[in-house]
Amino acid sequence: MVDCPRYSLSGVAASFLFVLLTIKHPDDFRVVGPNLPILAKVGEDALLTCQLLPKRTTAHMEVRWYRSDPDMPVIMYRDGAEVTGLPMEGYGGRAEWMEDSTEEGSVALKIRQVQPSDDGQYWCRFQEGDYWRETSVLLQVAALGSSPNIHVEGLGEGEVQLVCTSRGWFPEPEVHWEGIWGEKLMSFSENHVPGEDGLFYVEDTLMVRNDSVETISCFIYSHGLRETQEATIALSERLQTELASVSVIGHSQPSPVQVGENIELTCHLSPQTDAQNLEVRWLRSRYYPAVHVYANGTHVAGEQMVEYKGRTSLVTDAIHEGKLTLQIHNARTSDEGQYRCLFGKDGVYQEARVDVQVMAVGSTPRITREVLKDGGMQLRCTSDGWFPRPHVQWRDRDGKTMPSFSEAFQQGSQELFQVETLLLVTNGSMVNVTCSISLPLGQEKTARFPLSGW
């Protein structure tokens, strides 16, 4: 008989479990990326990297770079070859797989001609079979905008406004004003607007007294690039003479126009001054983009608002007298509101403001009736194609107002109002009920419904 050493069953089981826990799964790995964000300027290329640990070949793995959804990769490789037809929208032709050192598990994504929309987090995922690990890489996109331009607009009553403008920034920059001794000055208004390309246009306004002799500076700072653009203006050099020498006159009353017709905005210099060598800008709320810009004898198309492209023309017959008329063709409801007409030279402007009222007279009302179960009657008056929102009123045969049961207004794609109003009638002796729909400027359409024989 052979004697065997005594081992407890529980001890054997514990030892076996320990061995299992200390043996790594054959697919066990992790992924690491850069500790700091990757900074890239708009228009340049960005290189994002990640590393498989422990280091080993990725030849038989699936590797993908993606933003938020793994099923929509920026780029993906499987078994050493790119999987085509999958690039996320916006990255076609710009995302490139870089052969960094795939034998050691190092991969890289190059994004060409970086855009503002590329800013943000990316994920690098390695997958082998059903086992995967990933890490995130932060791409910070930045763009240094243009040198600021400070222009002066005269407001009268001892005050002027300084407007600091610049374009081409990303992300949104920080803007501040300083006086001659470096003291901070508070902005009157700030507008930082992203353009179609994702870059920010900056427009900050400062109010000052026009008898000031200070030098004032506008600073625009990029936190991402840690760089500043600045501009300085000495108020005493311009305001005493140029702003006081001329004023701009516009319409004193709002200009009403119907949808589809042409809007005419006329403004002129007083006293009469030849404006051929001046810059003239028609604006809405901001300096840029503009409704229409005239400079150096021609229209500056590159500064025009998208919604006005192809719809404006300039009448310059009296430009030698300082008079110009802007025509806005095919008026829309969105054209309603205030416009600013600026005449300027060398960054000094005077302005006038003109209000435009856009209206649309709708269809002739249509009245239909419905007999109710209780013996009463409900009249429904409908019409469409109105702007602005019209006033609706029911009147009896003597012209007295009758309270409506309900009123409903809906706006369609062109912002025109559709009207529906209900009237409950219980008095069978009532005849000649009128539905009236009118605009604030007095335009009115009516329909009459004779209530007889019921």
Curated annotation (Swiss-Prot):
Tissues showing expression: Highly expressed in intestine and at reduced levels in lung and stomach. Also expressed in thymus, spleen, lymph nodes, T-cells, B-cells, and macrophages.
Keyword Disulfide bond in record: yes
Signal peptide: none
Membrane topology: Single-pass type II membrane protein
Residue ranges annotated for the Ig-like V-type domain, each copy included: 27-140, 148-234, 244-355, 365-452
Cystine connections: C50-C124, C164-C218, C267-C341, C381-C435
GO BP terms, alphabetized: negative regulation of T cell receptor signaling pathway; positive regulation of interleukin-2 production; positive regulation of T cell proliferation
Similarity-based family: Belongs to the immunoglobulin superfamily. BTN/MOG family.
Name the UniProt record assigns to this protein: Butyrophilin-like protein 2
Originating species: Mus musculus (Mouse)
Lineage: Eukaryota, Metazoa, Chordata, Craniata, Vertebrata
Gene: Btnl2
